[in-house]
C-alpha cells in the first residue's frame, strides 16, 4: 500500500489524511484486479474516495456524512461537480469557499452554480 510520500499517489492525495490515501489505494488495487491497470481503475478509485471525502483546494478532507456528493454520483447521470459536496454544504458554505478561491460573481450564483465554479477553480 502506498505511503504518504509514495510517487504513485496523486499529488492531491499526498497532501490528504492517511485514511483518504488508504481508501484510494485499496480501491485502486481492487479495481486493477478487476479491470486491469489504467484509466478505468483510477476512475473507480476516485469515485470511491468521493463517497467519504471532498476535494478542498489541493487536498481531500472527510465529509460530514458519507455518500454521493452530487446528483450524477447518486443517479449515474447528469452533471458532476468534481468532488465538491453539493448535498453536504449549504449555499453559504459554498459561497465562503468560492470567496476563498476568488470566484467572481459569486454573490448572484445559485448553490449549483457555486459548486460548478468551485469545481472549475480547483482543477
Where do the language-model regions lie?
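Basic helix-extension-helix modules of the SAP/HeH family
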Residues: 75-123
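Intrinsically disordered, low-complexity charged/polar segments
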Residues: 56, 60-74
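Helix N-cap / loop-to-helix initiation motif
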Residues: 37-40, 110
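Short, mixed-charge, low-aromatic patches
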Residues: 1-5, 70-75
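Amphipathic alpha-helical segments in structured regions that serve as interaction surfaces
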Residues: 1-35, 42-56, 63
